[in-house]
UniProtKB/Swiss-Prot annotation:
This is Mitochondrial import inner membrane translocase subunit Tim8 A. Belongs to the small Tim family. One of its GO terms (biological process) is protein insertion into mitochondrial inner membrane. Keywords: Chaperone, Disulfide bond, Membrane, Metal-binding, Mitochondrion, Mitochondrion inner membrane, Phosphoprotein, Protein transport, Translocation, Transport, Zinc. GO terms for cellular component: mitochondrial inner membrane; mitochondrial intermembrane space; mitochondrial intermembrane space protein transporter complex. It is found in: Mitochondrion inner membrane. It comes from Rattus norvegicus. The keyword Chaperone applies. GO terms for molecular function: identical protein binding; zinc ion binding. Heterohexamer; composed of 3 copies of TIMM8A and 3 copies of TIMM13, named soluble 70 kDa complex. Associates with the TIM22 complex, whose core is composed of TIMM22. A motif (Twin CX3C motif) lies at residues 43-66. It is a peripheral membrane protein. The twin CX3C motif contains 4 conserved Cys residues that form 2 disulfide bonds in the mitochondrial intermembrane space. However, during the transit of TIMM8A from cytoplasm into mitochondrion, the Cys residues probably coordinate zinc, thereby preventing folding and allowing its transfer across mitochondrial outer membrane.
Length: 97
């Protein structure tokens, strides 16, 4: 039994590059869908007083502004995380100090 678990571990290490790419793409899609869901929920709660047969101009402007601010904020956070990640020393380098 131990040999099968070690062989499955080595099989995971040698995953087909196409499969890895597929998994990465699907993970990105899932993250995007989660982001859209969060944005929709947040903006709906903020902008929609009472659902009606037609979206009034105030609600439409609120939705547009909400979505733009959500995207701006998300982009700002991603950029800040990227800067922070680049400025941190590599873990192995910090151990050698």
């Amino acid at each position: 039994m131990e040999s099968s678990s070690s062989s499955s571990g080595s099989a995971l290490a040698a995953v087909d590059p196409q499969l890895q790419h597929f998994i990465e793409v699907e993970t990105q899609k899932q993250r995007f869908q989660q982001l859209v869901h969060q944005m929709t929920e947040l903006c709906w709660e903020k902008c929609m007083d009472k659902p009606g047969p037609k979206l009034d101009s105030r609600a439409e402007a609120c939705f547009v502004n909400c979505v733009e601010r959500f995207i701006d904020t998300s982009q700002f956070i991603l950029n800040r995380l990227e800067q922070t990640q680049k400025s941190k020393p590599v873990f192995s380098e910090s151990l050698s100090d």
